[in-house]
């Protein structure tokens, strides 16, 4: 009854309200959401997703439909860890990162959704967690934000109750990054955790 009957995948293009930029990938005008659903012979279904910054979604769906769905169909959904390893090995010849990782991630989440539904337990309990709380931070794709808008967004994060924030860095001039980092630190004070993310765009010297 816990055997997988069929697997489906869909791609959704989600337009953004404004252009978002980072130092490595440039401007984002939309995100792609790849949703996967795994249905068992007993009718129970689980859903998972992965997302992109606007490129590669069609390829991810194709890998699910043509390679991973046939692999999963007919297999027992109970041993999620074994299925995860099996999916990786099934497509290892064409890579364990990139498109393959996005496709497997969506299906792995769907399998965990099934496991939780079957046990009628939340995910944190199924993972052995002793708490239903975790440390969280708030950040955005904000490299193109003028400084006043950046600071306003940080104030919004603090108003939401976050005690850790992150901004993008990687401006053409290092001095501009330093200016933005200094302004954010002055705004949030010393008690808020502060992170920066250059998306691999900075060399060692910078």
Name what the model sees in each region.
Residues 1-195, 199-205:
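N-terminal capping/lid subdomain adjacent to the active-site entrance of alpha/beta enzymes
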């Amino acid at each position: 009854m816990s055997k997988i009957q069929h697997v489906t995948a869909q791609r959704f293009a989600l337009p953004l309200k404004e252009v978002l930029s980072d130092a490595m990938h440039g401007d984002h005008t939309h995100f792609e959401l790849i949703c996967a659903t795994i249905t068992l012979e007993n009718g129970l279904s689980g859903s998972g997703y992965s997302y992109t910054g606007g490129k590669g979604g069609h390829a991810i769906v194709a890998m699910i439909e043509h390679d991973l769905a046939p692999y999963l169909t007919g297999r027992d959904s109970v041993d999620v860890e074994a299925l995860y390893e099996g999916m990786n090995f099934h497509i290892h010849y064409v890579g364990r990162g990139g498109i393959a990782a996005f496709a497997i991630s969506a299906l792995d989440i769907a399998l965990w959704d099934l496991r939780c539904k079957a046990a009628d337990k939340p995910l944190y309990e199924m993972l052995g967690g002793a708490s239903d709380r975790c440390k969280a931070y708030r950040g955005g794709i904000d490299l193109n934000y003028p400084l006043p808008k950046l600071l306003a967004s940080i104030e919004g994060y603090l108003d939401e109750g976050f005690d850790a924030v992150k901004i993008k860095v990687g401006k053409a001039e290092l001095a501009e990054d330093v200016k933005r980092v200094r302004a954010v630190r002055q705004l949030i004070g010393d008690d808020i955790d502060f992170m920066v993310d250059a998306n691999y765009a900075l060399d060692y010297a910078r």
